[in-house]
UniProtKB/Swiss-Prot annotation:
The gene is IFNT7. IFN-tau genes are intronless. They evolved from IFN-omega genes in the ruminantia suborder and have continued to duplicate independently in different lineages of the ruminantia. They code for proteins very similar in sequence but with different biological potency and pattern of expression. This is Interferon tau-7. InterPro entries: 4_helix_cytokine-like_core, Interferon_alpha/beta/delta. Keywords: Antiviral defense, Cytokine, Disulfide bond, Hormone, Pregnancy, Secreted, Signal. Its main location: secreted. PANTHER family: INTERFERON OMEGA-1, TYPE I INTERFERON. One of its GO terms (cellular component) is extracellular space. Pfam families: Interferon. SUPFAM superfamilies: 4-helical cytokines. Gene3D superfamilies: 1.20.1250.10. Constitutively and exclusively expressed in the mononuclear cells of the extraembryonic trophectoderm. Residues 1-23 form the signal peptide. GO terms for biological process: defense response to virus; female pregnancy.
């Protein structure tokens, strides 16, 4: 009986360690997926951005919030998650299917979904009871407004090729910022369960 109890205790301790399945660490895989998504977005370029200069718009990327030190660790994870979720939602539509090479678009959506899946394993552990407050956080509201502006712009421009090209370039900026945020979270310790 003592042996079984010792074995169970050891199993619990290992589960919560860096190599355990219950710890919530930002993995190297997450960063590799992020880089691959940026590479795919770059390959999706169909038009010269210079030919679409008349369609340029400042969407108000909250770059200083994402890349600066404004976010606390408990805010950084939900912001990262929301940015990836909104990016996925933007590209996983009928309108985007008509605008892009289907293979590249599917690969991008799969890559974004893989990042979200990895973060989903952490989400419940990190957010816990705070999840109900997620939609009320100012940084989350800022991210949602940013993406709503992108959706509104596309609709206003009739989902034209130039509008999508402007959005593609903007999404490269946004995903680069989210990658910077991932790196910041990793520097904060990577373990999203710690304070």
């Amino acid at each position: 009986m003592a042996f079984v109890l010792s074995l169970l205790m050891a199993l619990v301790l290992v589960s919560y360690g860096p190599g355990g399945s219950l710890g919530c660490y930002l993995s190297r895989r997450l960063m590799l997926d992020a880089r691959e998504n940026l590479r795919l977005l770059d390959r999706m370029n169909r038009l010269s951005p210079h030919s679409c200069l008349q369609d340029r718009k400042d969407f108000g990327l909250p770059q200083e919030m994402v890349e600066g030190d404004q976010l606390q660790k408990d805010q950084a994870f939900p912001v990262l998650y929301e940015m990836l979720q909104q990016s996925f939602n933007l590209f996983y539509t009928e309108h985007s299917s008509a605008a892009w090479d289907t293979t590249l678009l599917e690969q991008l959506c799969t890559g974004l979904q893989q990042q979200l899946d990895h973060l989903d394993t952490c989400r419940g552990q990190v957010m816990g009871e705070k999840d109900s407050e997620l939609g009320k956080m100012d940084p989350i509201v800022t991210v949602k407004k940013y993406f709503q502006g992108i959706h509104d712009y596309l609709q206003e421009k009739g989902y034209s090729d130039c509008a999508w090209e402007i959005v593609r370039v903007e999404m490269m900026r946004a995903l680069t910022s989210s990658t910077t945020l991932q790196k910041r979270l990793t520097k904060m310790g990577g373990d999203l369960n710690s304070p």
